[in-house]
């Protein structure tokens, strides 16, 4: 049987909208994951059953078994001793929803992907990219269980290292999809100063570093201490004796709540300054309306995010405000990806043609 011929304009639009939907689902997944963490729900399911775990407990006996499993881990005895079954159900549903959404994303990616390939809609370069993204998605599921497993034995919470890895990998997949969607757009290439391309790339890299630091803050609950601003521990820059009291010194960068919060603050200031300079440079360089708009939107989002971060800290991490802070972080990342891709697209005409899009 011969496959039907599909018009290029139509099939590229279909692929783009599918990828946009996948990016939105991943953003939702990150927010649900954030709510799961903030409600202390992440360890409520102590088993990893990729297929049979799709169904929640359906009887009183099954609920009792799930609750008994939770009672065996340190978090229950040290943090939630005396919790009722109804209280357990609340945290269970958060974690179950998070895992179910992950399974749904996997299916929502794989089935259309296979269909698009069967219809011959995907050029070879695009297929390779999408297979890599799918592989990263599978890895993300394994990393999620690796993270949960860290809190089932001696710890009462998951490892902050694994939490940060889980978050950054999710947002790396999200960014790869956003970048790919951009590369499927038919746009004229831009001639922009090299320094704008460099600063956009630096901003994107530092946003990922900041996301990692933010996950460390969350994992260590470092946002619930040193709740003053602009000072921290009584001064703008704490003493080195307080910042680096653990040995070896580099462990403080990941384990010391003061150091982790301090580096998160300093990275925020750095990002804000570079974003402002990038916007000014785009305007002065007359880099084009799209580049200027992108730079201004990015600077505005950075300003909003910094403000939300300060408010979240001063109010000791209320759940709603913390989730808004996390949501705006995704917006900042999206704008950083779009701006970097926009400025680097001038050197990527061949890549866009390899994806089946003619560059103007």
From Swiss-Prot:
Q: Which residues bind heme?
A: 264, 325
Query: Single GO cellular component annotation?
Result: plasma membrane
The protein's matches in InterPro entries, at most eight in alphabetical order, are given as: COX15/CtaA_fam, HemeA_Synthase_type2
Q: Which UniProt keywords apply?
A: Cell membrane, Heme biosynthesis, Iron, Membrane, Metal-binding, Oxidoreductase, Transmembrane, Transmembrane helix
List the catalysed reactions: Fe(II)-heme o + 2 A + H2O = Fe(II)-heme a + 2 AH2
Protein family membership: Belongs to the COX15/CtaA family. Type 2 subfamily.
* Subunit: Interacts with CtaB.
Query: According to its UniProt entry, what is the function of this protein?
Result: Catalyzes the conversion of heme O to heme A by two successive hydroxylations of the methyl group at C8. The first hydroxylation forms heme I, the second hydroxylation results in an unstable dihydroxymethyl group, which spontaneously dehydrates, resulting in the formyl group of heme A.
- Write down what this protein is called: Heme A synthase
Upper lineage is:
Bacteria, Pseudomonadati, Pseudomonadota, Alphaproteobacteria, Hyphomicrobiales
């Amino acid at each position: 049987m011969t496959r039907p011929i599909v018009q290029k304009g139509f099939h590229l639009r279909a692929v783009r909208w599918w990828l946009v939907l996948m990016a939105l689902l991943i953003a939702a997944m990150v927010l649900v994951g954030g709510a799961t963490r903030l409600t202390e729900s992440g360890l409520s399911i102590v088993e990893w059953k990729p297929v049979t775990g799709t169904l929640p407990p359906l009887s009183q006996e099954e609920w009792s078994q799930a609750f008994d499993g939770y009672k065996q881990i340190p978090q229950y005895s040290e943090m939630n001793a005396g919790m009722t079954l109804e209280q357990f159900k609340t945290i269970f549903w958060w974690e179950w929803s998070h895992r179910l959404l992950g399974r749904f994303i996997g299916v929502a990616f794989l089935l259309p992907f296979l269909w698009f390939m069967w219809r011959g809609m995907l050029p070879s370069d695009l297929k390779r990219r999408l297979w890599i993204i799918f592989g990263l998605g599978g890895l993300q599921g394994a990393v999620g269980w690796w993270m949960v497993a860290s809190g089932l034995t001696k710890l009462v919470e998951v490892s902050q290292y694994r939490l940060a890895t889980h978050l950054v990998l999710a947002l790396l997949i999200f960014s790869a999809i956003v970048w790919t969607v951009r590369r499927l757009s038919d746009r004229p290439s831009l001639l922009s100063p090299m320094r704008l391309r460099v600063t956009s790339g630096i901003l994107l890299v530092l946003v990922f570093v900041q996301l990692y630091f933010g996950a460390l803050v969350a994992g260590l609950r470092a946002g619930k201490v040193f709740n003053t601003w602009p000072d921290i521990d009584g001064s703008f820059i704490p003493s080195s004796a307080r910042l680096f009291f653990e040995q070896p010194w580099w462990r403080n960068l990941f384990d010391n709540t003061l150091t982790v919060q301090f580096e998160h603050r300093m990275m925020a200031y750095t990002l804000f300054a570079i974003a402002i300079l990038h916007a000014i440079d785009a305007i002065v360089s007359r880099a084009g309306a799209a580049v200027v708009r992108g730079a201004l939107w990015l600077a505005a989002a950075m300003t909003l995010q910094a403000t939300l971060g300060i408010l979240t800290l001063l109010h000791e991490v209320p759940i709603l405000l913390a989730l808004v802070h996390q949501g705006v972080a995704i917006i900042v990342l999206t704008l950083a990806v779009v701006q970097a891709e926009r400025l680097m697209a001038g050197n990527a005409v061949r890549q866009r043609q390899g994806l089946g899009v003619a560059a103007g």
